[in-house]
Amino acid sequence: MPFLPWLLLVVCMALASGCAVNPATGRDDFVLMDEATEQELGIRYNQDVQQRYPRYPDAQLQAYVQQVGERVARYSHRPDLAFIFTVIDSPDLNAFALPGGYIYVHRGLLAYLGSEAELAAVLAHEIGHVTARHGARQRSQSQAWGAIGQVAALGTGVGAVADATQLLGGALVRGYGREMELQADELALQYLARSGYDPQALVKVIEVLQAQDAFLRSERADPGRQAGGYHGLFDSHPAHEARLRQLMSRETGPGVWNRDAYFQALDGLVIGGPVGQGVLRGRHLSHGPLGVALDYPLGWRVVSEPDSVTAYSPDGAVYLGLRSEPVDPGLSPMTFLSARVGGRHLLDARTLDGAALPGATAWLAGPPARRVAVAFGDARAYLFVAGAEKGAALRDADAQVLATVLSLRGVTEQDASLAEPVRIRTVKVGKGQHLTDFISVGNATVSTRDLENRIRLLNNLYPIGDVQPGDWLKVVR
């Protein structure tokens, strides 16, 4: 037998033996690792996640989510597994599970849920991924196709064959994706009913996420905005939802929702990006890590990170980036700027007259042309770069760009007062009160329409709907 077919046969036979009984379904699944290896993989991935995502700094909320998760996990197919539930300090609407029982839920998703039962539904879905060993299955499938690709590449000398089989492996995993998500939902329904929660909460979460999607579709003019959608429950289609409702009819029992406990736990939850990434209120950004504050043009989208800020014009045609780096105090802003752009020719170079901090600005010859600027403060240089695919768009926005650069300053007491993050406050609706009674723009940081939409989304009342006396309501302060 020729070498390559023989080697492929050996590899395929070895892979074919890699089956294990799925603890959640009782069926044989293709898995190339035992549960001990799966645990080790989860520990390693968990360390990576901890480095990438900050933990939300609220011990009481963390303990509450852990308590709810443990209640559901006790009734899963792997009750002896030590599940660890963690709230991530992220505004995204997402949750995910790692092999071995590590489950993460983003702070942003908690803000839009309306009961403990809905939180339990999200956690039950992720527990289902763990009990069915979906992470181990995906990794095993990827390893299998990778091994076949390496053998084919070895025999043919063509690396593209390996790439093709890797792509095929990826397609296989994506094909299993919908099946795995539905299986996780089916398991979630079982776990919710067994642990005493109302299984209807699973559909309620889907409705919450669908409202988010409808809102984002209506806000297409917002450039660079990403849905940050939940991969799990919302990764569905009508057939999926119909199947869920059919399965739900089997899971009988009243079940609890525990809205009071959830709203009390949620009071004070931060809305928006982590404080360590700067706090944006309307046009005003106060950035603690960078040690500065500045004002952006109305309608611009501002993306703040721990070490940088990028803003986009309303049509997305122009961007303005800001970074900070140490600077030699003996340099002048103009000398620094010239050196920082590698000696390239600067056009219309001048000092920043009227700025709170000493600085300089110029046009950098293209293509594409860019506006560059620098300001000095506390032995640091704050470097701005503005650009656009079309030079005309940048020139049209140049006055706004320069106004933003000139607004850069150290953090004042007023800036510090505005740097407090926006938080959810939970209240009970009184007799005769309506949703509009709770919409107070306050410091004019957002429009009345935007605030109403936000409150509607937070309370699953988008696009229409009103509150009733005695209802819990999330408001923004």
Where are these regions (language model features)?
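Extracellular LysM carbohydrate-binding repeats and other cell-envelope/extracellular binding modules
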Residues: 449-477
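Signature of long, low-cysteine stretches enriched in small and polar/charged residues
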Residues: 321, 337-388
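Short solvent-exposed coil/turn linkers within tandem alpha-helical repeat scaffolds
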Residues: 395, 445, 461-462
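Surface-exposed amphipathic alpha-helical segments
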Residues: 120, 254, 300-302, 386-426
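A Zn2+-metalloprotease active-site environment signal
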Residues: 6, 19-292, 296, 301-302, ...
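Sec-dependent bacterial lipoprotein signal peptides
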Residues: 1-19
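Primarily a LysM-type cell-wall glycan-binding module
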Residues: 415-446
